[in-house]
Amino acid sequence: MDKILLHLASLQAIQERTIAETLVQGLRDAQPADVDYQTSNPYPDLIHIVGLSDRATQQLMSRAGRLRIPYIVTPLSSLQPWTHTRRPHFPPATILVASSQLEYEQLAKLYPENTVLLVGNPVVSAAITFDDYARRMQEVYAEALASHDAAVRDDIAQRVGKLGEEDAAICDILRQALYVGYEHRRHHIQQTTLDRLAATMTAANYDEALMADRLEELQLTSSFAQLETFLADHSTLTEGFMPIEAHPNKNFTLP
């Protein structure tokens, strides 16, 4: 985990806003290991939304959805059954963090498809310290990232699976290429992801003509040709192991 963007919603009630601000500041001050709190990074690994009532928060969630950036939500009781005529929708991988047993039970009923966790709020409870809260949230962050990554990989596997292709090597390369595309949209391509794909393309024995057909079916021919150039520039792939002719890299994207 590299960077966590912590967003503070502008709640209407002064008391709730004070609680949210105090909670956010305490979380930053605790500085749990492996977590870098940045509010200016437009492409974080994870977004933690504290409070949930203003338009800016809704826009933040919409942008996260478009870029497939995972986020967790600590509503601070802003999702009570009587506070919303239209409750916000959260992707199934989104984790909701309740601050009390009552809120936990209510969120579990309102969002049965989401994971709901109970983590005490050190601002209003002496039963948990800010250090303990930060350590617990670090575990929640790791869980959220793992859940989101599994969902992304499952979506990719389903997309490739619809081809009905039986060649395992072709399917593996397509899945890895689409995952590189996902990381590219997130502005966070891991070198290990590139190296693994380059190594797979170099070692695999597959029908290059069939691969070209599958790329055409997925409408990935142009993007994959640019990805080949990207792999040659940033990893170990060489021309002899490219199934189609490489094109100059013009900031490739794989939908």
Language-model segments: what does each one mean?
Residues 104-123:
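Helix-loop-beta element that forms the nucleotide-linked donor phosphate-binding surface
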Residues 66, 79-94:
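A conserved, positively charged/aromatic
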Residues 135-255:
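Conserved NTP-donor binding/palm subdomain of two-metal-ion nucleotidyltransferases/polymerases, i.e.
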Residues 119-128, 134:
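Short beta-strand->alpha-helix junction loop in the catalytic core
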Residues 93-101, 117:
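A short beta-strand/loop micro-motif in the catalytic core of glycosyltransferases
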Residues 1-39:
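N-terminal subdomain of nucleotide-sugar transferases
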Residues 39-57, 70-74, 187:
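Short N-terminal targeting/anchoring amphipathic segment
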